[in-house]
Structures are given as C-alpha cells and as structure tokens.
C-alpha cells in the first residue's frame, strides 16, 4: 500500500497542513516537540483507531478547537481511496471512506495497515504484561477488524462483572445468580480472545525467530510463548473445551475474587513471554539486545501483515532509526527494500546509513509546519 497524501486540520499542533509523499522513504527532521511524532500518530490512528499517547480524543484536538480532521489518500492494490477521520472534543468520531460515512468503526480498520516502531516499544521487553497484550491486540485489529467488537464486548462484560463483585451480597439480592450469567459471558468472550491471540503468536514466532537470528548473526535464539492466565490445552481446541477450562478457573478463584472485588481470571491478565537463549529477555541489560528483539518483532509483524493482506503495510519509525547501529540499519533496509513505504522521524541525520538518505524525501518539521529540506539541510 502507499500513502499518497495526508491532510491534518486542528490535529495536535497542526492547524492546517497538507503533505504529498513522493518517495518510498520520507524522513521528518526537527527538534523535539515540533510535531514529528504527531504526524506518525495520525497515520497510526488511521491504521488502528487507537493512540498510544492519548487516553481521550480531546488531547488530539488543537487547543480550543472543537474537532480535528485527518484526511488521507491511500492506494491499495492499485486502487486509490479517500479516507477521513473526524475527532471531536466530546469523544464522538466520524469515519468516511470514499465519501461514505461508516456506521461501525470496525469497517474502517484495514483501510490502512501500519507497523510502528518507537522508543515506546522497548516496553515490549522491559515493561509489564499489558504492553505485550496491547501489542498482540494491535496486530489482531489490523488482521481481523471484527476483533475490535470482541475486545469492546469483553471490556464491557469485565466492567459489569467487577461492579457486581464489589457489591455487598446482602444488598445485591440475587448477586450469585447474576454472577453465573456474567461468568458464562466472560468465559465465552474471553475464550474467543485467547484462541485468536494464541493462533497469532503461533504465526509470529517463527518469523520473529528468523529475523532475530539474522540480526544477531545467529548467536541468539528468540522464543515467544503465550502464557494465558487460563491454561490453554491447545490453541486449536474447540471453544467448548476452552470455556470449560475458563469456568473451572473462575470457580477456583471465586473466594479471592469476591474478597478483592475484581476479576482475576481472563485474557486481561495474560502474558507473552519473550526469551533469548531460554532466558527471559528482560534479564538482558543491553539496550542493543533489547532493540534487536523489538526490531525482530516489528519485522515479523510487517511480514505477517503483508502475507495476510497481500500488500506491504506502512512502516513508521519514530526516533529509533538513528539509535540503531549501522548493522541493524542495513538489516532493516535490506528487509524492506523499496516495496515498503517508510516514514522516519529524527532530530538529526548524521548517524543514518547512506542507503536511507538516498532518494529519500526529507522534510523539516517546525511548530506544526512542514518545509521541504534544502540540499544539505540537517546533514552534518
């Protein structure tokens, strides 16, 4: 796929900015807090409908404006599409594809596919389980747009069940009969999420292991293991088998759940274990090794999305390329070649391999405005 153009109105620190992408690689150069990451965030929103930096849409709207707009022209499999996302301070969104307003947000997913690699992604290695769950879910949203509805349904069930757990049994009346209902709902929806996560990781692991071997020169072996909070007998097991296991775990932890007033069983507590040579990756102190691992995960993600949708996704590199040594830069360049459109942000170009700068579109970013870079600008 190819992002032909992007138009940001009242988005973050962009008042009204259009950009046409005219090269496979676009490098955005500027000081911190000028808007480089904001531009990549807009593209990521088109791909996932989620921001990793904002909890509310209000944070995405420029100052006192009431709404922001992200418009893009995207070419997929040789066909151009016009996409529009409107974000309101109230939290209400509207989405359009080729001028048609969409009723469901899930129908927008898949219009843009993107893989993002930023400094935040080092949390995949050194952060808690939530970072790794969010990563898996983000990939699933792009591969299976219907997964969005499943996740939203699970969160709603979890809220209802937690509210019931917090109630005083004496005041809640038929609390326990209600709990049976929500237990069944949690098990049904949670099992569907678990099966999808397990199947995804089965497909990602060999790809990530391959890229990790390539980047590390064959010196290290990477393994990814899904550790669901509910023991999963087999990712291919029937939904009924998994649901029965789920309900058994709920019964085993019933007393603790009622005591704490919180659900202790379900995919909201899953873990993805990352190991290098059989040792938990977080035990490795080297930032170089951590970056190698995350780069392998991102290349696996990129390769899998390309296999499934039959079109290379966009690659968004936010202030990480210059931090990779020349070997890793070259491995990444070799992996994506010219077929993957790449948007890169950086504060300087001095540590870039010449292969990245060759024929790249270089833009200066200053105060929410973009300027074509003159020859030599920003290049020591």
UniProtKB/Swiss-Prot annotation:
Positions annotated to bind ATP: 30-37
GO cellular component, one term: cytoplasm
InterPro entries the UniProt entry points to: DNA-binding_RecF (IPR001238), DNA-binding_RecF_CS (IPR018078), P-loop_NTPase (IPR027417), RecF/RecN/SMC_N (IPR003395), RecF_2 (IPR042174)
Top-level taxonomic group: Bacteria
PROSITE patterns: RECF_1 (PS00617), RECF_2 (PS00618)
Main location: cytoplasm
Keywords, in A-Z order: ATP-binding, Cytoplasm, DNA damage, DNA repair, DNA replication, DNA-binding, Nucleotide-binding, SOS response
Record-level GO BP terms: DNA replication; DNA synthesis involved in DNA repair; double-strand break repair; SOS response
An annotated Gene Ontology molecular function: single-stranded DNA binding
Compartments reported by the entry: Cytoplasm
A Pfam family per the record: SMC_N
Main function: The RecF protein is involved in DNA metabolism; it is required for DNA replication and normal SOS inducibility. RecF binds preferentially to single-stranded, linear DNA. It also seems to bind ATP.
Homology family: Belongs to the RecF family.
Protein name per its UniProtKB record: DNA replication and repair protein RecF
């Amino acid at each position: 796929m190819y992002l032909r153009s992007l138009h940001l109105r009242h988005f973050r620190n962009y008042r009204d900015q259009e950009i046409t992408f005219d090269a496979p690689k676009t490098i955005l150069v500027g000081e911190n807090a000028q808007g480089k990451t904001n531009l990549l965030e807009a593209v990521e929103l088109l791909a996932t409908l989620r921001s990793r930096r904002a909890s509310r849409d209000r944070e995405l709207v420029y100052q006192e404006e009431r709404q922001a707009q992200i418009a893009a022209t995207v070419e997929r499999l040789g066909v151009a599409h016009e996409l529009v996302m409107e974000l309101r301070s109230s939290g209400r969104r509207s989405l359009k594809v080729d001028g048609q307003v969409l009723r469901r947000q899930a129908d927008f997913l898949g219009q843009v596919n993107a893989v993002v690699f930023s400094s935040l992604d080092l949390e995949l290695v050194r952060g808690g389980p939530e970072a790794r769950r969010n990563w898996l879910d983000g990939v699933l949203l792009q591969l299976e747009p219907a997964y969005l509805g499943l996740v939203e349904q699970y969160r709603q069930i979890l809220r209802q069940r937690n509210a019931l757990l917090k109630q005083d049994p004496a005041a809640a009346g038929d609390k326990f009969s209600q709990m049976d209902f929500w237990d069944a709902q949690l098990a049904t929806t949670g099992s569907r999420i678990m099966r999808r996560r397990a199947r995804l990781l089965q497909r990602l692991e060999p790809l990530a292991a391959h890229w990790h071997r390539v980047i590390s020169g064959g010196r290290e072996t990477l393994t990814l293991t899904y550790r669901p909070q509910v023991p999963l007998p087999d990712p291919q097991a029937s939904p009924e088998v998994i649901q029965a296991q789920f309900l058994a775990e709920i019964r085993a932890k019933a007393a603790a759940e009622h005591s704490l007033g919180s659900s202790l069983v379900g995919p909201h507590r899953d873990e993805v274990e990352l190991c290098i040579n059989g040792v938990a990756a977080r035990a490795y102190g080297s930032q170089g090794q951590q970056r190698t691992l995350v780069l392998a995960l991102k290349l696996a993600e990129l390769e899998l999305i390309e296999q499934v949708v039959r079109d290379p996704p966009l690659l968004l590199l936010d202030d990480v390329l210059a931090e990779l040594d020349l070997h890793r830069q070259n491995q990444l360049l070799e992996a994506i070649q010219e077929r993957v459109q790449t948007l890169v942000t950086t504060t300087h170009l001095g540590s870039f391999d010449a292969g990245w700068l060759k024929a790249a579109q270089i833009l200066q970013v200053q105060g929410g405005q973009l300027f074509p870079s003159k020859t030599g600008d920003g290049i020591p």
